[in-house]
Every structure is written in structure tokens, then in C-alpha cells.
UniProtKB/Swiss-Prot annotation:
Self-association state and partner proteins as the record states: Homotetramer.
The protein's role, per its UniProt record: One of the enzymes of the urea cycle, the metabolic pathway transforming neurotoxic amonia produced by protein catabolism into inocuous urea in the liver of ureotelic animals. Catalyzes the formation of arginosuccinate from aspartate, citrulline and ATP and together with ASL it is responsible for the biosynthesis of arginine in most body tissues.
Stated name of the protein: Argininosuccinate synthase
Residues engaged in binding ATP: 11-19, 37, 116-124
Matching PROSITE patterns: ARGININOSUCCIN_SYN_1, ARGININOSUCCIN_SYN_2
Catalyzed chemical reaction(s): L-citrulline + L-aspartate + ATP = 2-(N(omega)-L-arginino)succinate + AMP + diphosphate + H(+)
InterPro entries referenced in this protein's UniProt entry, alphabetically: Arginosuc_syn_C (IPR048268), Arginosuc_syn_N (IPR048267), Arginosuc_synth (IPR001518), Arginosuc_synth_CS (IPR018223), Arginosuc_synth_type_1_subfam (IPR023434), AS_cat/multimer_dom_body (IPR024074), Rossmann-like_a/b/a_fold (IPR014729)
The keyword Cytoplasm is annotated on this UniProt entry: yes
Alphabetized UniProt keyword annotations: Amino-acid biosynthesis, Arginine biosynthesis, ATP-binding, Cytoplasm, Ligase, Nucleotide-binding, Phosphoprotein, Urea cycle
GO molecular function terms attached to this record: argininosuccinate synthase activity; ATP binding
UniProt GO BP: argininosuccinate metabolic process; L-arginine biosynthetic process; urea cycle
Entry EC number(s): 6.3.4.5
Signal peptide extent: none
Organism listed in the record: Xenopus laevis (African clawed frog)
Length: 411
């Protein structure tokens, strides 16, 4: 028997690609530890465990990291109102460093010098996985089969993988594969590739799995009261049926359920990948969409104007850092700490209506709001002297007068 080349921890999904990669790694002489993260996807984890063992995995780890995902990754994104290129709420981007962190922990525990993944050589995920691994385990060696000529020249498409699976008794679904790829976690589901690569093609009606079609969703709204402390949601109450959740995971799952029922969170976009190409993606982010709108509202209600301008600039940088895979970079740690500081007084309750694919803010209250009802009232003068506005306007007009004087002289 030939000597092992070493131990590799494979980020395993149980699907065709990573099942073939598991067997291929064994062919190359590696001992393989399969690691499957429960990050909120719809998966038969015990069946995946049995499959990995049958394929020859030396050991199988199935790790439930859903709560860690919510509290350590999703909540900072909610605090930041993190959104990439104005539309994408970063579901996959947030999940990858969370998954890879646990993969590194397992590799260290098992004294494995290699980690591996099934991400393609054209996408963002390879970057997110590997930058996390190198940050947390600098001496690690990474095996990325879809970047290795000996692998991608051998497996040029799904038919080659299917043939290899048949040869090695790798069980594959008997139903035809959807003509697109899908990635699911607690935050969202993404769909891309296949027929969706033509940006003109409409999403087929049967594509969406997390959200109901808004056109056929309920005609009556759910009214939710969402409570925030330091910019983090701490309680949700359905005012109609009095359902209430305050634990992070249960709260997020409940928002997914309500938003999904009403068709909230669908987007179809073309985005810029970090490696330089544009790609078309369709996303369902139900709970994330509700929290984005609710947090945006309570933050505007409680935060100083100039402070919020700076925070918005940081939020854009934060979204780019997450998308590009730099969660564990010094600049991202710095931005996260600044955003966390900005949230100290972001506390209160937001009332939202969820209906027909939309989230409507109905009202808000906060113990430390900068909103002064008497000061802003049209009916009460309060401490504000309207005459003071004259000087304010004249000072601000100086610059405009000078600009237009210059424009006039140019003619």
C-alpha cells in the first residue's frame, strides 16, 4: 500500500462535484476528512455523512454553525446596512468566511496540512475560502481541483463527472439537474449559470424556493415589531398573532418564514465579480430584506447626521470587503469596529408591514432618539427662532453667488 501524501479537510456538500473531488483526492493518495457545514441549507445531513463514509472519507464532521453565522456575520452586516453595488445583501459572501473558519479549526485539530474546496476557478468563492484559510492558518496548503489542469482537463462538464461517479459507485440524483446552479444558506439562496447566463432570459416560475410569488401571496399583511439594541435585532413580535422570538437564530428563521410567505427579498441583477468579470445572479434574501429596511429606519431616527454620513461611507467599503473575501483583513476588522461604535445609541422599535413582496415601515420609537417633536413642529416655535435662518441661508449663498459670478464672466 502506497504511503499517504497527507490529510486534507474537504469542504463537502454531498453533491456531485465534491463527491467526485473526494474520490479523486483519494486517487491522488490523500487521506480525506469530509467537512459539511450546516449553515441553514435544506439538506439530509445524515445521508450526506453516510455517503462520505461510503466514498472513503477517513472521518466526517457535520458542524451546525447557524447561530455563529447569524451572530458573528449576519448581525454585523445588518448593523452596517451592508449592500454590494446597491442591491446585493451578501448572503453567500457572508457565509464563506464562516464556513472556512470552521474548516481551518478542524484542519488544525486533525493536524491536516491541506484543505480543499469545490469552488470554480472563475468565481468569487475560491477567493473567499482561501483568503480566510490563509489568514487563520498561514502555513496551510490548498488544493483547488477546478484550478488544476489535471482535474479540469479530465472533467470538462457534468457528463464527465457523471461518468466518473458511475465508475466509482458515487450515488447521484436520479432526477434531472436544474439548468442552473444554486447555493443556499440561512441568509439567502442564489441562482446562477446555465440558462441564467443569458441576462435576457427570465427566471423560470419554478426557480424560487424561499419565497412565494408576490402576485399569489396573501392579501393581508403581517405587521411586525422589530426591536433593536446597539443596531442588532433582539426581538420580533407579530402584532397579529402575538408570535414572539428573541433568540438570534429563532428570530432570523421566523423573519425568513414571514418574508418568504409574502414574496419579500427577490432580486435579479448583474454584478461585478472581484476577479473582473460581470455575472448574472438571482437571489432570495427574505429576512435580510426586512432587517435592512427596519435597521435603516431606526438608524436614521437615532444617529447624528454627520456621523451617519461617515458610517455610510464605511458601510460601502465594508460591503466590498465582504464581497471580495477580506473578512479577516486588518482593514475589515477596523471598519467593523468603527461600525460597531456607531451603533451604541441605535436602539428602539420599528413597526413594519410585510405584503406582496414589499416591506413598508409604519412607525418607530426609541428611548434615545434625536428626533425632537416640539423642535420640528409646524405648530410650536419652541427653542428655534425662524429669524436665525436668514443668516444661515446668506452664508450658504456666498459660495453659490461667487460660482455664478465666475460663470457669467466666462461668457
Amino acid at each position: 500500500m502506497s504511503q499517504s501524501k497527507g490529510t486534507v479537510v474537504l469542504a463537502y456538500s454531498g453533491g456531485l462535484d465534491t463527491s467526485c473531488i473526494l474520490v479523486w483526492l483519494k486517487e491522488q493518495g490523500f487521506d480525506v476528512i469530509a467537512y459539511l457545514a450546516n449553515i441553514g441549507q435544506n439538506e439530509d445531513f445524515e445521508e450526506a455523512r453516510k455517503k462520505a463514509v461510503n466514498l472513503g472519507a477517513k472521518k466526517v464532521y457535520i458542524e451546525d454553525i447557524r447561530q455563529q453565522f447569524v451572530e458573528e456575520y449576519i448581525w454585523p452586516a445588518v448593523q452596517a446596512n451592508a449592500i454590494y453595488e446597491d442591491r446585493y445583501l451578501l448572503g453567500t459572501s457572508l457565509a464563506r468566511p464562516c464556513i472556512a473558519k470552521k474548516q481551518v479549526e478542524i484542519a488544525k485539530k486533525e493536524a491536516a496540512e491541506y484543505v480543499s474546496h469545490g469552488a470554480t476557478g472563475k468565481g468569487n468563492d475560491q477567493i473567499r475560502f482561501e483568503l480566510t484559510c490563509y489568514s487563520l492558518y498561514p502555513e496551510v496548503k490548498i488544493i483547488a481541483p477546478w484550478r488544476m489542469p489535471e482535474f479540469y482537463n479530465r472533467f470538462r462538464g457534468r457528463s464527465d463527472l457523471m461518468e466518473y461517479a458511475k465508475k466509482h459507485n458515487i450515488s447521484v440524483p436520479v432526477t434531472p439537474k436544474s439548468p442552473w446552479s444554486m447555493d443556499e444558506n440561512l441568509m439567502h439562496i442564489s441562482y446562477e449559470g446555465g440558462i441564467l447566463e443569458n441576462p435576457k432570459n427570465h427566471a423560470p416560475p419554478g426557480l424560487y424556493l424561499k419565497t412565494k410569488d408576490p402576485a399569489t401571496s396573501p392579501d393581508e399583511p403581517d405587521i411586525l415589531e422589530i426591536e433593536f439594541k446597539k443596531g442588532v435585532p433582539v426581538k420580533v413580535t407579530n402584532t397579529k398573532n402575538k408570535t414572539q422570538h428573541s433568540s438570534s437564530l429563532a428570530l432570523f428563521c421566523y423573519l425568513n418564514e414571514v418574508a418568504g410567505k409574502h414574496g419579500v427579498g427577490r432580486i435579479d441583477i448583474v454584478e461585478n465579480r472581484f476577479i473582473g468579470m460581470k455575472s448574472r445572479g438571482i437571489y432570495e434574501t427574505p429576512a435580510g430584506t426586512i432587517l435592512y429596511q427596519a435597521h435603516l429606519d431606526i438608524e436614521a431616527f437615532t444617529m447624528d447626521r454627520e456621523m451617519r454620513k461617515i458610517k455610510q461611507q464605511l458601510s460601502q467599503r465594508f460591503a466590498e470587503q465582504i464581497y471580495n473575501g477580506f473578512w479577516y483583513s486588518p482593514e475589515c476588522e477596523f471598519v467593523r469596529s468603527c461600525i460597531s461604535k456607531s451603533q451604541e445609541m441605535v436602539e428602539g422599535k420599528v413597526l413594519v408591514s410585510v405584503l406582496k413582496g414589499q416591506v413598508y415601515v409604519l412607525g418607530r420609537e426609541a428611548p434615545h432618539s434625536l428626533y425632537n417633536e416640539e423642535l420640528v413642529s409646524m405648530d410650536v416655535q419652541g427653542d428655534y427662532d425662524p429669524a436665525d435662518a436668514c443668516g444661515f441661508i446668506k452664508i450658504n449663498a456666498v459660495r453659490l453667488k461667487e460660482y455664478h459670478r465666475l460663470q457669467k464672466n466666462k461668457k
